[in-house]
């Protein structure tokens, strides 16, 4: 059944590529993957393979990639992605020697791919459970590790009807899981080699903070040295349901400056954002100059790659996605010692639950709950600062997963 589903997905991508640009990139990338390997793989080199579904999973694996690169330079790094949103952004990443798409997990694709490259070990990040690739790696006695994985009782592996697919988990040499519940669930289905290490994203956001870049135009907008400086609210990875809530508030409150870094930066969505903003001076980052940004009320980030550094300039952050499929990366904001707000779809995100528990994160349900929180932060600077410190402390307290993983891997 699994292989039938994989062939159906492959067929769907092939057909969809005729009409959809994202699927077209994925299809072409998958078709070229083995050719790229045949051209670039050095026969005598030892490759460590990292696979990430998309950009978020790559960021979880990145601390491991760079630590191995630094401490074990004799290895070369192969990095694969499933999604264009990961590959297209990181295809020129200097931390890997070869970067490709991973072809759909059919038997034929897996065999061709692993004939073209024979890694000495593999790391699959978080939710990557590709049976045919994993089965071949296991058959060849190649160690394969699941990193930053997290499991819940409602996942298919732990249901009576998912026992067949659950066999894929037995292909892993070891699991590096985020919490005790994940380890216990694996133990219940006969998998004992699981180590609790936490989430490598905590290490990653601390690295980002350490290496953050100055953004002169954002500094000009924030104007921190001004005697009458306004507080700055940063909305990261926002979607329209998020924007409708916080923009309604800021249309009524002029004591804040607002930076919006929407998840989608297409012109249609940017026009929608502009239509929601009333009576404020708005500047798009790509059009910003020193002379027009200082007295602006709203700065819209209409390009990628800046958000993690932009959070540095905020006093309160909002992370989008909580009114849709799920919140985006709250740790990128929390590491900067400020309160982090997000929508209600956060129950499956351990880091959001941790921030809520420790007092650095706040759940927003609607305009009224958002307004109450923002008014409190505006009126009580000591409270806002204390909540921000709790957010930063939470991130620092859970760092160290990268070293824990590497101490349990034979390199």
Question: Which functions belong to the PLM regions below?
Answer:
Residues 142-144, 258, 282, 340:
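Hydrophobic beta-strand scaffold residues
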Residues 398-411:
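C-terminal alpha-helical cap of glycosyltransferases
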Residues 202-206, 233-287, 295, 301:
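Inter-lobe coupling/hinge segments of SF2-like helicase ATPases
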Residues 113-115, 168, 292, 310, ...:
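Structural alpha-helical scaffold elements that stabilize or flank donor/cofactor-binding regions
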Residues 201, 283-324, 329-330:
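Donor nucleotide-activated moiety binding/catalytic core segment of transferases
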Residues 1-26, 274:
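Helix-enriched interaction subdomains in cytosolic or periplasmic regions
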Residues 172, 188-189, 307-393:
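Catalytic binding pocket for nucleotide-activated donors in carbohydrate/polymer assembly enzymes
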Residues 14-211, 215-217, 224, 234, ...:
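Active-site and donor-binding regions of nucleotide-sugar-utilizing enzymes
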């Amino acid at each position: 059944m699994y292989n039938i589903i994989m062939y159906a997905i492959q067929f769907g991508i092939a057909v969809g590529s005729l009409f959809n640009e994202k699927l077209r990139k994925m299809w072409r990338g998958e078709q070229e993957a083995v050719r790229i390997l045949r051209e670039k793989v050095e026969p005598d080199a030892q490759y460590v393979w990292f696979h990430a579904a998309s950009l978020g999973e790559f960021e979880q694996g990145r601390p491991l990639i760079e630590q191995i690169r630094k401490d074990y330079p004799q290895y070369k790094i192969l990095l694969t992605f499933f999604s264009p949103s990961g590959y297209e952004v990181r295809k020129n990443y200097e931390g890997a020697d070869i970067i490709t798409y991973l072809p759909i997990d059919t038997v034929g694709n897996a065999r061709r791919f692993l004939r073209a490259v024979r890694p000495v070990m593999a790391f699959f990040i978080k939710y990557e459970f590709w049976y045919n690739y994993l089965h071949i790696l296991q058959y060849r006695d190649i160690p394969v590790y699941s990193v930053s994985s997290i499991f819940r009782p409602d996942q298919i592996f732990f249901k009576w009807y998912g026992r067949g697919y659950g066999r894929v988990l037995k292909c892993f040499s070891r699991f590096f899981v985020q919490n005790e519940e994940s380890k216990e669930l694996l133990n219940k289905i006969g998998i004992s080699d699981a180590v609790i290490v936490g989430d490598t994203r905590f290490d990653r956001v601390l690295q980002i903070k350490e290496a953050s870049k100055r953004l002169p135009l954002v500094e000009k907008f924030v104007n921190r040295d001004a005697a009458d400086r306004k507080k700055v609210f940063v909305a990261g990875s926002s979607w329209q349901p998020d924007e409708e809530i916080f923009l309604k508030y800021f249309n009524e409150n002029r004591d804040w400056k607002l930076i919006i870094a929407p998840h989608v930066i297409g012109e249609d969505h940017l026009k929608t954002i502009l239509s929601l903003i009333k009576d404020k001076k708005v500047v798009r980052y790509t059009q910003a100059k020193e002379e027009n940004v200082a007295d602006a009320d709203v700065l819209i980030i209409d390009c990628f790659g800046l958000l993690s550094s932009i959070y540095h300039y905020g006093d309160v952050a909002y992370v989008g996605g909580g009114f849709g499929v799920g919140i985006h990366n709250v740790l990128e904001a929390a590491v900067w010692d400020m309160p982090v707000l997000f929508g209600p779809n956060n129950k499956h995100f351990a880091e959001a639950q941790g921030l809520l528990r420790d007092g650095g994160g706040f759940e927003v349900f609607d305009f009224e709950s958002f307004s109450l929180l923002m008014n409190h932060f505006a009126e009580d600077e000591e409270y806002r600062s204390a909540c921000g410190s709790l957010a930063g402390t939470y991130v620092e307290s859970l760092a160290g997963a990268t070293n824990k993983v590497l101490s349990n891997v034979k390199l």
